[in-house]
Amino acid sequence: QPLRRALAIYEDKMNTVDVMREYNEFERKRINSFNGVKKTDSNLTKFVSNNRHGSYISFFSFDESLTESIVKEQLAYFNKLNLCFEWKTYSTDKPTNIGDVLLANGFEKEASESFMVLDLSKTVGESFDESQITEVSDSVGIRDAIRVQEQVWGGDFDWQYNYLLSLKEHSPDSVSIYVVYVNDQPVTSAWLTFNGSSPFAGIWGGSTIEEFRGNGYYSLLLNKRIAEAKSKGVKYLIIDASDMSKPIVSKRGFEIVATTTGYTSPNS
């Protein structure tokens, strides 16, 4: 019996290597290029934003001996355009010396997050109060969603606003944006993205203004997005989970696939 139970648990466990391979193929190499352009060569895929902020290296794979020259090449490319960019890395990426080389070239390391995946075929929907959620799709509503992010994280999120607005205008089915209002004040915002025929949907945002935390708004929007992704027949739901959100999403069945760390360019 114990052996059978152990085998059942083993069989039920997500094959994280396969999931990461699929994610690289469908999400990191095939990116939405609204409010910017996607550029690909044999070494990497990048998104070049129309705004000063918002550009990033999405996928990369090359020999360790080339790391220094490729990093310098990308720095020169974005500097020429006067753009800041993020080099997003995963613990499964090659070459493994990428982090050290980025730091040596003046990049700033951001806080690492857990890249987590939920197999939607194995999750059960939870009931939630739909009446507390407002879906936004126009410039005013999207601005409200971004205002929450700016208050929580600090800084200018205009690039994020422009990206979401452009995505909603040009490919409305690719993104669903949600806000929780309390007395007409936006206090929590989050969005859900779909990428064509990709088996992955992504949950982003998920932030609540400090004085309104502890009311279940994060879980409310999490449950809404799980239900929507499941209803659209998507296979996996992904999140870059901070230490604060990791215990909440773990309870819903999300599993850690990798650690993800962003490095911001020196001119940011």
Residue ranges and their predicted role:
Residues S139-Q151:
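A short, well-structured alpha-helix characteristic of acyl/acetyltransferase catalytic modules
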Residues V48-S58, F194-I203, R213:
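A conserved beta-turn-beta hairpin within the catalytic core of GNAT-like acetyltransferases
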Residues L81, V148-W159:
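Helix-loop element at the rim of GNAT/NAT acetyltransferase active sites that forms part
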Residues P2-Y77, L81, K94:
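N-terminal charged segments
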